[in-house]
Each structure stands twice: as C-alpha cells, then as structure tokens.
C-alpha cells in the first residue's frame, strides 16, 4: 500500500473556503479502495481542534516560526488526521486566510511555511511508526515543502504539487528569506524568486517531483499567457512532469431526490414558489456562484435578454462584487422572470440544483468546477464556457452531439456576451424539443462524476512515484 500524506490548508468537513477543501476531504476515502493509504495534515485552526478535542499529542516542536507547536492525531472519517497545533499561528478570530478586517493575515507566509515544515518533519522522521512515501501538496500553502525536505536531507520521499487555482501564488517580500528559513542561493529566476518576491507556489512548481492540476484542459491552458498568470513559462518547463486529473464529487452527499428526470417537476414547481417566479413554459435556469467577473456573471447580465425573450427564467444565489450584486438586484426588480438571493445557503443551493432545468456556469476560466458536476448528477443541464474543467466534463449539444445522442449540456466559445446570448437562445430552443431535452437529461444523470476514475489516476501516479 502506497503511503501518502496530503498537506492542505483546508479540508471538508472541518474547514472550507473553496474547492481545494472538497478535494482534500474526498481523496482519502476515494483512494482507500485503490491501494493508497492517505493521511492528512491540516493547520490547527479552532474549527479543526474543536472537532478533534482531546486528541493525543504525537510530537512537540519547541519553536516553529515564533512559538511552540505540537502535532496531534485526529480523524477525518476513516482516515488518520494530523493536526499542526500552533496557537500563535492559527488560534485567532477571523477567517483562515483573512483577518476580521477582510485583509490577508500579515504573517500568512510564516503560518503556511510552518505547515510545510511540519510536513517535512513527518517525512524526515515519521510519526506513529508511519512515514510517507509521497507528499501530496495542495496549492501555495504547501508549496515550500520540497525546499524544507531538501534542507532536512530527505531524498527518498517524493512530492506532488496540485494547483487548484493559479491566481493564488503565495507571494512574500524578499526580506522574509531569513524569517522563512529559506536558502538564499535558490532565490533566483530558476528557483522560487518571482519578480523580486518569494513565491511559494513557484517553489512547489519548480522543486516538486511532479505537478498536477484539476483538469486536463486547465493543464494545457496554464501553459499559455492567457491563463498562466505569469507562471506559464515555469509550467511549460515542467511539461513532462505536469498532468491534469479531473476532480469528482461525493455521490452519496450529492444524491438527487428523484431517480429519473420526470421526478424533477415537483422540485421545479417548489423552487419557483420559493423564489416568487411565475409558472411559465420555459426553462428555469439557476446560478449558484460567487458573483465575480472570473465567473463571467457580468456577461450573463449583458446576455440576460436572450434568456428572458425566449421564455426562460433565472434564479440566482450568491454574493461577491457589489456592482454585480446591484446589477442582479436591478434585473430582479425589473423582470418577473428573475429572482435573487444574496449570500450562500447550502440547503437552498441543493434545492436550486434539484429544481432547476439548467445551471449556468459562464466562467472566463475554471480550473475544474463543481457546480456543473452537481448539475449533471441532478439532470440539471449545464450551460458552460468552453474552458478548463467545464470543457472536460460537459458534452456539447452540437449537431453532431445531438445526432449521436451523447450531449449533456451546452458549451459556448469565445467567452463573451454575444456568444453567451446565442447559447441561451439555443438552450431555450432545446427546451422546446422534449425528446432531445429528455435524452440530454438521461445522459447527464448517467454521466460518471464521482471520484472513481480520478482516484485511479491519482493512485497510479502515486504508485509510480513511490516505486
């Protein structure tokens, strides 16, 4: 059995701000049946320690970036959880990355360097008579680990860095080299220096044995200037060691309340009632998203007439950019077929995916995306931009896709308002072709969106790395 330590800054069900947490939480169970024994290392935030009360201390660390720390043992479902209990770094009010003022904690570089140091310590010395063969590092927060492994003289433990979102690069000023206990001779363009600053993400990309991201298309995109956000050259240099493995979803946690597409009707009616939308002979489209430009929702505002003029409706759940919040509120006030709920409500999001006919994901870039996978699972047809994981998970209702009977949704490209308008018009036209729509719903609900294929891909990669 390959021994793997997953090093992450967040993990469901303990703490979550984004999709990274879903992957970190799902992989241990998904890999258990693939011959991989994965354990997880997390920072000791209050929520994590609270869920693992009175856990045994496995290791004392006298000084870890300004204070004492301990490695504790907990549980993550059936998987072993290691907790880095460092109160001076993690026991504080606010979010896990942001303070109560909404700004990054100024000591974030030290906080997550500590996580990397703890991972390197476990790799070097083991814990509980267990020592990993592979460290699975998630995003910049775990990116310095390969450097600390080098410093510890560890040569027999391999590292995989998974990039969940290239936009977060773990930048710190150069004067922090000493504070972060980093070797000055690696602070150069071939190392972890990035435009005069330290980049923890670049450190991981350059020094990890392998690099992955969360979909094959996003892997290709990241090696281009349009999507690479300055890291495209570094990733292109690692192209032979860089791969894309799709995320999955927990099929038990996301189980539709109906077995066939016909079961959607009462949920659609209930959702219309909940949002105050009138009954109409058109598709009920839903958006469950952060309201940001990255998600392409400014384009949806511009393209909205195409949906409404063709009899469609829109229900939106989310929050984010104040300008977009105001734009959707204005649209809801003007049009009976548009409704908005600001904020996030997990139970409501599930009711929306169950009751909606289509889920709109017009993102400008999307590493993998989860909402379109939920839509497929529930027979709520995804309308998506042709980018990242959206391109890899939805089969377009093109003439060929419909003729072959394999379509599961609607894709559009390029990602602009005019093309989105045409896609919305096409979606509404398909709605009025009941046989085609029914076939697409059947295809969507049968489409494999769980972790099985992804877990096999990770297991094969880990096994090859450990050999």
Curated annotation (Swiss-Prot):
Its EC number is 2.4.1.21. One of its GO terms (molecular function) is alpha-1,4-glucan glucosyltransferase (ADP-glucose donor) activity. Keywords: Glycogen biosynthesis, Glycosyltransferase, Transferase. GO terms for biological process: glycogen biosynthetic process. It comes from the Bacteria. Synthesizes alpha-1,4-glucan chains using ADP-glucose. The gene is glgA. It catalyses: [(1->4)-alpha-D-glucosyl](n) + ADP-alpha-D-glucose = [(1->4)-alpha-D-glucosyl](n+1) + ADP + H(+). Pathway: Glycan biosynthesis; glycogen biosynthesis. GO terms for cellular component: cytosol. This is Glycogen synthase. Belongs to the glycosyltransferase 1 family. Bacterial/plant glycogen synthase subfamily. Pfam families: Glyco_transf_5 (PF08323), Glycos_transf_1 (PF00534). Signal peptide: none annotated. It is an enzyme of class 2 (transferase). ADP-alpha-D-glucose binds at residue 16.
